[in-house]
């Protein structure tokens, strides 16, 4: 399937011209090269229909042909806006919603923001859709706090959306008056609805606000989180730490299978959403804290806190050495690392394996078809330093005699000491064994002289050693 925007240097889908099966193979090979040395890499989990999966769209306003307002995306490595009416990756409902936004903005005579001159009103439009609920959010990003004729704009937008058979759930104005490439500003005003939408993921319902981190591919997110929870091997008795928890999606998915879940996230708004999501879903065994994950886990480990399972879902730059050091101090039985960057995942696995963890499996998931990005679920377990390994050996294949299998020199010394109080050396034991006809292995530490002078075992100690040999049924 081809796209007209590719010829215009869109850059959003660098692998679109490649057969999807070939894309999956290439991504799987990439993960194998990076992670194969740590443990087995499973087959990549791809999509049946790898199109129109993005439930979040950000469009930038600009001036089009004839001075008419239009919107689109930035060309690769550029600030030039490419007008977009439809996209092979975007949710088709959101394409229609964006068409309605443009029509309403034109009807209200709004002008696009000019970043060079600092003039104009409309900067961006952020759209979100709950895939399971069908709810749609429109966030209009403006360069100034006042939206002229805001009520008229809302009315026009709802009317235009209805023409497209789209029902809008909420409309929010976000104010970004800074000269920056960051999309959202700090101030928001709800123009219509409640300012958030709901969606269902892995059996839980989530409130999604304009700033919420929520995976953009609903289908593959359920695959990703399902793999993560399965990798935790939860029985209902575990204390689980969900680090970098966002709005609580992984932790709340795991809560039904754990004793307690503790989530940590640096974004306070996300933590607010996570707490609300727990209440909305009736989850009473989950707590959430607004804190830097590295600092929080460091303090928790120093205080003697423990977790049975730790979920890690860090940003693209990966985790930190300090975080991993604290993981080792908390000593969870299992660590489940959800990564969006296999390069930083490989770096962090190097540290985790040095700290006594074994990689059981790594499973790549194609969250972003036609792009080069790869998500990976990595399951790790703590090595048991007391773990016993059963090995079947044939005695006739070893350089060891039948008598030697019955007692070691140390066991003979201990027996003699316990029963007679005498201390006997290995040399004395060897002399007595030789007298008794017990065949010994070759002594690789024997003296260089042919007839070396050596002490002879005293009669009293010889009798004690013979009693030990009889006890161990060696004579």
Report each predicted region and the residues it spans:
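Rossmann-like S-adenosyl-L-methionine
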Residues: 148-401, 409-410
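Extended interfacial segments that mediate partner engagement and assembly in macromolecular machines
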Residues: 11-112, 127, 132, 146-147
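Phospho-regulated, low-complexity intrinsically disordered regions of nuclear gene-regulatory
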Residues: 454-475
